[in-house]
Amino acid sequence: MKKGFRGTGTVERVDFPNKGIAVTDDGDRVIVKNTIPGQKVEFVVNKVKHQRAEGRLMEVIEKSPLETEEPCPHFGICGGCTYQTVPYEKQLDMKLTQVKKLISDAIGTEKESGYEFIGIHGSPKKSEYRNKMEFSFGDEYKDGPLALGMHKRGSFYDLVTVTDCQIVDEDFRTILKATLDYFSKNNIPYFHRATHKGYLRHLLVRKATKTGEIIVDLVTSTQTEGFNEEELLAGFRYALLTRQYDGRFKGVLHTKNDSVADVVKNEGTEVLYGDSYFYEELLGLKFKITPFSFFQTNSLGAEVLYETAREFILGDDKDSLNGKTVYDLYSGTGTIAQLMAPVCKEVVGVEIVEEAVCAAKENAALNGLDNCKFIAGDVLKVLDEIEEKPDYIILDPPRDGIHPKAIGKIIEYGVENMVYISCKPTSLARDLQIFMDRGYRVEKICCVDMFPNTYHIETIVALHRTDL
């Protein structure tokens, strides 16, 4: 099969991350992304490597027997959701199957390696679950009217205005509509990615699930030719605050970003209304969150994730960490560290993002926890500098997993038990092989779905040292 070949096939399975395996009438297999098992699809081969063909999805000729009608009018055009036409229980089955295959391919099956795969915990909310969205300004087609929303599937430039997005609640949709209406009426240009000219770039919206507090951050360039920026922003603030919401506004912000890269970057933020932060609650703890703070995007799902992790860590003995030191590596804003602090002597968190470390320290103080210590720096380097030795290690690395040299240093501590929380099962499978080669065995695994209607999945693994 050569590059440029156009063909059809039936998707027999989907591997993580979202790689459909389509089988042609001749028995050839082609990887086609954004597909669902059972679909008959048309594809064009765009890559052939090591006799493995990859194709671009052109059309779904026949729906899968798994599919129902899509609840979102933007589905298939918007690049956000992939599994929205699949009933939620079937989504969970698909994700569990994908993770099980990756893990068994890497370290063997449950029977071969002696671990227990507990299953998968679903998200408490299947729709309207996100507490954060980053919308982009642009157009839906070249020289078209102003759009505000998500990138179209497979496009770096074209957008779809997601006024009926189903993974956020009505307050997000109201804010999007109010913002788009206001800047469209005032003929304000968006920042063109090709020419680097224009004003409007992104709209960052965050809403706490538990407290209902809302914060909005408008991200723009500093190119203000043709209008009075102060008057424009005052009108924007008024357009937002005069709408009706279920939650309540905590702050309206304006961030400047002249970077040519199409990412939200903070080069200076001013408060247009209220405060530059809001509060969210998880499992009885309170967290102060700024527009650019890392925080799990599904608050209720995060509670399931962290409660499951805590059960893995403590097991049946709730006093097992009394008097002991816990390392929380890749600690982010310190959520897990603060959940474990009440049941151990000390938690030491290490995180490379300084702003996240500052937030972790502030939140620990907010929750009255004086036995949390947070250090800013690369885990690989910081481990050489910490005097306290751990009795237990919690790992929650970014998507790329743990650097092999860092794994080596972690293993050298020789702790009896560890828990690894992963947001990318391919990275997890690779890292587990290293741990097992160096004297650890996998005891149990559980998946937690934080992202309904997408292919993303969290996985928690308990590791036990075998050569003690």
Annotate each PLM feature:
Residues 1-7, 13-17, 222-468:
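Rossmann-like S-adenosyl-L-methionine
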Residues 1-74, 111, 153, 373, ...:
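Terminal RNA-binding accessory module
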Residues 20-25, 149-152, 217-219, 360:
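Short, acidic/hydrophobic/Gly-rich beta-strand patch recurrent on exposed beta strands
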Residues 38, 168, 298:
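Short, conserved phosphate/pyrophosphate- and ester-handling motifs at nucleotide-, phospho-/glycolipid
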Residues 59-70, 79-190, 210:
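Extended interfacial segments that mediate partner engagement and assembly in macromolecular machines
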Residues 118-125, 193, 200-202, 447-450:
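Short, solvent-exposed loop/turn elements at beta->coil junctions and helix N-caps
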Residues 157-201, 222-254:
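Internal alpha/beta scaffold segment
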Residues 206-208:
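Structural signature of eukaryotic scaffold interfaces centered on beta-propeller domains
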